[in-house]
C-alpha cells in the first residue's frame, strides 16, 4: 500500500512549494542511486520520494491528490482520474443517447501517442552553473524497422477482428435497478485496434515496436538548478498505429558542492581568517566559480561579516548577467599560544581598561601595535 505523499516527503499538508522542494532535495541527495550504488532499499526510497514530488510540486496534481488521494492517479479508476484515467464510462452513456452505434460500438482505437519517459541526470555544481552537454543512454520502445509499426510480417496485412468486427470494442449488458444498460469495453482480442494480426512480425512479435537503447545528446543550459525538468520533444517511446512519439523529460540532480551553496543565482561561502587579519586588515585569495580572486579585508573586521563579490554568482538562465557571491568571514580564535602571545593578550585587556579610563588611543590602535610586536617574535 502506498504511503501518503506528504508523509513520504516529511512535510505537512499546508507546506508551500519551497518547503516541498527543500524536503525532496534532501531525500534525493540522501537516497540517490549514485550515492548508494547497489542499495535497493535506497533506490526504492528515491523512487518513492520522486513520485511524491512529481505530484505535490504540481498545483493541479496536488489539488486532485488532496481531494481523492492515490486514486486520483490510478488508471483503473473510472471517472475523473489522473495519469491515464479515461472517461470510458461517460463515453458509453453519451454514445447510447447521442448515436455512436449504441454503447460506442462504432468507435475504434486509432493512432496512440507514445509514452513519455523520464531520465534522472546527475551533474556537478559547476556544470549546472555554466551549462554542459551530456550523452545519455535511454532504453525505449521504437517503431519496428521490419514491419514499420504494423505488427504484421512483411508481405502480410492485418485482418478485421472477428470478435469486435473491427469496432475495437465489445458490448455488455448490465442489469441495474433502473433497467438494463448496455455498455462497451475495449475488445480483449485486439486490444481495441479492431484488427487481428494472423502473421505477426518476428522482429517485434506483432507489437509494432521493439526495445532499443537510444543515445541522446542533452544540452544543459547555463544557470540550471537542481530539479529542473528539461523536455525533449519526440524522444520518448514510439506511438502505436501511426501515433506520434512521446517526449523525454530529463530531470537534473545537482551534486552538492563542498565549498559553495546556492540560493537562486547567488552563491554563498564561508572563509576563516585569523585574529591578526581581522584586526590589521588583509587581502585574501577567495575561491570563486571562475577561479581565485583577491578580496580586501578592512581593518577591524568582525566575525560573521559578509562581503559581496558582484558578478561571481550563477549565470541567469534567461537573459544576460550573473548573480553575486557572498563571502562570510569567520574570525578563528587561536587555541595554542606561546607564553609571549599570552602576555600580549593580557596587555590587550589592560589596554581596553586604560582606554575606558584615559580616553587615549583606540582599542584597535593598541591591538594593532601589539600584534605587530607579536609578528616580530
From Swiss-Prot:
Residue windows of the CXXCXGXG motif repeats: 144-151, 161-168, 187-194, 201-208
SMART domains the UniProt entry points to: DnaJ
GO cellular component: cytoplasm
Main location per the UniProt record: cytoplasm
Disulfide bond as UniProt keyword: no
Domain of life of the source: Bacteria
Residues in J domain copies: 4-69
ZnF (CR-type) ranges: 131-213
Positions contributing to Zn(2+) 1 binding: 144, 147, 201, 204
Cofactor note: Binds 2 Zn(2+) ions per monomer.
Binding site for Zn(2+) 2: 161, 164, 187, 190
Pfam hit, one: DnaJ_CXXCXGXG
GO molecular function terms noted in the UniProt entry: ATP binding; heat shock protein binding; unfolded protein binding; zinc ion binding
InterPro entries named among the record's database cross-references: DnaJ (IPR012724), DnaJ_C (IPR002939), DnaJ_domain (IPR001623), DnaJ_domain_CS (IPR018253), HSP40/DnaJ_pept-bd (IPR008971), HSP_DnaJ_Cys-rich_dom (IPR001305), HSP_DnaJ_Cys-rich_dom_sf (IPR036410), J_dom_sf (IPR036869)
Entry keyword Oxidoreductase: no
GO BP annotations listed: chaperone cofactor-dependent protein refolding; DNA replication; protein refolding; response to heat
Cofactor: Zn(2+)
Keyword tags: Chaperone, Cytoplasm, DNA replication, Metal-binding, Repeat, Stress response, Zinc, Zinc-finger
Subcellular localization, as worded in the UniProt entry: Cytoplasm
UniProt function note: Participates actively in the response to hyperosmotic and heat shock by preventing the aggregation of stress-denatured proteins and by disaggregating proteins, also in an autonomous, DnaK-independent fashion. Unfolded proteins bind initially to DnaJ; upon interaction with the DnaJ-bound protein, DnaK hydrolyzes its bound ATP, resulting in the formation of a stable complex. GrpE releases ADP from DnaK; ATP binding to DnaK triggers the release of the substrate protein, thus completing the reaction cycle.
Domain statement: The J domain is necessary and sufficient to stimulate DnaK ATPase activity. Zinc center 1 plays an important role in the autonomous, DnaK-independent chaperone activity of DnaJ. Zinc center 2 is essential for interaction with DnaK and for DnaJ activity.
Subunit structure: Homodimer.
Family statement: Belongs to the DnaJ family.
Xref: PANTHER family: CHAPERONE PROTEIN DNAJ, DNAJ HOMOLOG 1, MITOCHONDRIAL-RELATED
Name the UniProt record assigns to this protein: Chaperone protein DnaJ
Organism classification: Bacteria, Bacillati, Bacillota, Clostridia, Eubacteriales
Gene from which this protein is expressed: dnaJ
Amino acid at each position: 500500500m502506498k504511503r501518503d505523499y506528504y508523509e513520504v516527503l516529511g512535510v505537512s499538508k499546508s507546506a508551500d512549494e519551497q518547503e516541498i522542494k527543500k524536503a525532496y532535495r534532501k531525500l534525493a541527495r540522501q537516497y540517490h542511486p549514485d550515492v548508494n550504488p547497489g542499495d535497493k532499499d535506497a533506490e526504492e526510497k528515491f523512487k518513492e520520494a520522486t513520485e511524491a514530488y512529481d505530484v505535490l510540486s504540481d498545483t493541479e496534481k496536488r489539488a486532485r491528490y488532496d481531494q481523492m488521494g492515490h486514486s486520483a492517479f490510478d488508471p483503473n479508476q473510472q471517472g475523473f482520474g489522473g495519469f491515464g484515467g479515461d472517461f470510458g464510462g461517460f463515453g458509453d452513456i453519451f454514445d447510447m443517447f447521442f448515436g455512436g452505434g449504441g454503447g460506442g460500438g462504432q468507435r475504434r482505437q486509432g493512432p496512440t501517442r507514445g509514452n513519455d519517459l523520464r531520465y534522472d541526470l546527475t551533474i556537478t555544481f559547476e556544470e549546472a552553473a555554466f551549462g554542459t552537454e551530456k550523452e545519455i543512454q535511454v532504453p525505449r520502445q521504437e517503431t519496428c524497422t521490419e514491419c514499420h509499426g504494423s505488427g504484421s510480417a512483411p508481405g502480410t496485412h492485418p485482418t478485421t477482428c472477428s470478435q469486435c468486427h473491427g469496432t475495437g470494442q465489445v458490448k455488455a449488458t448490465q442489469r441495474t435497478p433502473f433497467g438494463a444498460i448496455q455498455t462497451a469495453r475495449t475488445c480483449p482480442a485486439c486490444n481495441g485496434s479492431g484488427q487481428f494480426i494472423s502473421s505477426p512480425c518476428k522482429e517485434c512479435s506483432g507489437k509494432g515496436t521493439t526495445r532499443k537503447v537510444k543515445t541522446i545528446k542533452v544540452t544543459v543550459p547555463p544557470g540550471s538548478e537542481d530539479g529542473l525538468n528539461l523536455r525533449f520533444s519526440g524522444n520518448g517511446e514510439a506511438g502505436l498505429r501511426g501515433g506520434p512519439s512521446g517526449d523525454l523529460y530529463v530531470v537534473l540532480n545537482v551534486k552538492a558542492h563542498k565549498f559553495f551553496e546556492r540560493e537562486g543565482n547567488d552563491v554563498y561561502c564561508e572563509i576563516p581568517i585569523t585574529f591578526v587579519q581581522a584586526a590589521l586588515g588583509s587581502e585574501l585569495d577567495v575561491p570563486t566559480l571562475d577561479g581565485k580572486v583577491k578580496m580586501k579585508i578592512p581593518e577591524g573586521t568582525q566575525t560573521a561579516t559578509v562581503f559581496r563579490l558582484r558578478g561571481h554568482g550563477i549565470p541567469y538562465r534567461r537573459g544576460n548577467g550573473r548573480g553575486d557571491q557572498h563571502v562570510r568571514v569567520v574570525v578563528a580564535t587561536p587555541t595554542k599560544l606561546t607564553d609571549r602571545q599570552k602576555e600580549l593578550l593580557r596587555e590587550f585587556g589592560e589596554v581596553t581598561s586604560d582606554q575606558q579610563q584615559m580616553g587615549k588611543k583606540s582599542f584597535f590602535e593598541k591591538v594593532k601595535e601589539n600584534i605587530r610586536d607579536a609578528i616580530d617574535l
